[in-house]
Swiss-Prot record:
GO cellular component: cytoplasm; manchette; motile cilium; sperm flagellum
Lineage: Eukaryota, Metazoa, Chordata, Craniata, Vertebrata
Database matches in InterPro entries: IQ_motif_EF-hand-BS, IQCG
UniProtKB keywords: Calmodulin-binding, Cell projection, Cilium, Cytoplasm, Cytoskeleton, Differentiation, Flagellum, Spermatogenesis
GO molecular function: calmodulin binding
Name of the protein this chain belongs to: Dynein regulatory complex protein 9
Record's subunit section: Component of the nexin-dynein regulatory complex (N-DRC). Interacts (via IQ domain) with CALM when calcium levels are low. Does not interact with CALM in the presence of Ca(2+). Interacts with the HSP70 proteins HSPA1L and HSPA8. May form a complex with CAMK4 and HSP70.
Residue span of region Disordered: 1-41, 102-121, 410-437
Signal peptide (residue range): none
Family per similarity comment: Belongs to the DRC9 family.
Name of one Pfam family that matches: IQ
Compartments (UniProt record): Cytoplasm; Cell projection, Cilium, Flagellum; Cell projection, Cilium; Cytoplasm, Cytoskeleton
Length: 437
């Protein structure tokens, strides 16, 4: 196809069609990085802008190359093994080829003389594929192709399916491009197919990269899981040893507690007998104490009655004092409230007076600021006047000097004799110089 395109003298816009053929046929064994590099090198940016239709000669050349390609793809389809072919895709391909053959003979009126255009398209006929199948030749070809065991190992089912899908896709794209070239003289369908295929390949590469990252993560997680399992096993072993140690301690504690229980039982029996003796003695003592307490309570009741009478009298006195102090509190609070009201009124009057004073102070400050501004203006004006006067005096002095030096008007400087001699000498020197020149 490259030789056909170079021989057809196509413009540069038509060259991306060859890129699709080279990109779609990558082997499946290449790594992801190599695929990405080849895809980046092979991708040529094609914008779906409005393309100018090609010339009739270019259309005919490209159509011839594309028809040759479709014929080769259809032959490849028939060479494929029967058990891996898709019958439906073959029938659809045959229908498209028949339709293309009919349209190629009809849609020739792209130029003024249809006889010259239709002549190169008519002799390009579909290869006679049914004749190849006659006499069992197709089965013989298959037997020859797949006779060796190496071919059987390489051409597995998945590879054949992928080849068949790629072949069908390429055939469809070329067919649509051929129809568009014959109808409109452009190949936008080819550019669109290029863009879609490029996007699908980039998505495929991204999927492969994500899968590799996932595998790496799974490997790292498996390593972590093994490490965790080892740690857990070591921890379980340590805990089992600790449990055995605790069981030994438990047996020792049980034996120790049994001995302590026997000792405590005997000890408690002795203590009970001793406490019973003590209790009998203490009971006698408590009875004596109860009698004493009874006498004491009678005396306390009598004292309590006397204290209660005394407290009632004191309570009455305190209530009278409380009434007195409550009345005094009311009077004092009323007096203090009056004083507070008087202080508030005085505060309000003082506040009003302070506000008036603040207002007066602000007015005085404004007057002072205005006076300072006025003084500053007069000072600047005085300085300006002085500056102007000095400038005028300097200007007058300069003018007087200029008038005197240049003898303007009636002003002339007195000339001495020596000066006249010098002037004459200078005149003679000037005349000598002029003569030399």
């Amino acid at each position: 196809m490259e030789e056909g395109l170079e021989a057809s003298n196509l413009p540069p816009e038509a060259w991306p069609s060859e890129v699709t053929v080279s990109v779609t046929g990558e082997p499946p064994n290449t790594s992801v990085e190599e695929k990405e590099e080849t895809a980046k090198e092979a991708v040529i940016e094609t914008s779906p802008e409005i393309m100018k239709p090609l010339s009739i000669l270019d259309v005919l050349r490209i159509s011839a190359v594309l028809e040759d390609t479709t014929d080769q793809l259809s032959i490849l389809n028939y060479i494929m093994p029967v058990q891996y072919e898709k019958r439906q895709s073959i029938s659809m391909k045959d229908n498209k080829e028949m339709h293309l053959e009919g349209r190629s003979s009809e849609k020739v009126p792209l130029a003024s003389n249809p006889s010259k255009i239709s002549s190169p398209l008519v002799h390009k006929e579909e290869p006679k594929l049914p004749e190849i199948r006659q006499g069992g030749q197709f089965n013989k070809v298959q037997d020859l192709i797949f006779k060796k065991p190496t071919r059987q190992t390489i051409m597995n089912t998945e590879t054949l399916k992928k080849i068949q899908i790629d072949r069908q896709f390429l055939s469809d794209v070329i067919t649509e491009t051929l129809e568009e070239l014959q109808e409109e003289g452009t190949f936008t369908n080819l550019l669109k197919a290029l863009g879609k295929e490029r996007e699908s390949k980039m998505h495929f590469y991204d999927t492969i990269a994500r899968e590799e990252n996932g595998r790496k993560k799974i490997k790292s997680l498996q390593k972590q899981l093994l490490n965790v399992k080892k740690e857990r096993q070591a921890e379980v072993q340590n805990r089992n040893e600790y449990i055995a140690h605790l069981k030994d301690q438990l047996q020792e504690m049980k034996a120790k507690t049994n001995m302590e229980n026997r000792y405590m039982k005997r000890n408690t029996e002795l203590q009970i007998s001793q406490t019973q003796k003590k209790c009998s003695k203490t009971e006698e003592l408590l009875l004596e104490e109860i009698e004493k307490l009874r006498l004491k309570t009678e005396e306390e009741n009598r004292i309590h009655a006397e204290i209660e009478l005394f407290l009632r009298k004191e309570q009455q006195k305190l209530e009278e004092k409380l009434e007195f102090w409550m009345e005094k509190f009311d009077k004092d609070t009323e007096m203090k409230q009056n004083e507070l009201n008087a202080l508030k009124s005085a505060k309000a009057s003082d506040l009003a007076h302070l506000q008036e004073l603040a207002k007066t102070i602000r007015e005085y400050e404004q007057v002072i600021i205005e006076d300072r501004i006025e003084k500053e203006k007069t000072r600047k004006k005085r300085e300006q006047d002085d500056l102007e006067m000095r400038s005028i005096i300097k200007l007058q002095a300069w003018w007087r000097g200029t008038v005197v030096r240049r003898e303007i008007g009636g002003f002339k400087m007195p000339k001495d004799k020596d000066d006249s001699k010098d002037v004459k000498g200078k005149g003679k020197e000037k005349d000598k110089r002029r003569g030399k020149k």
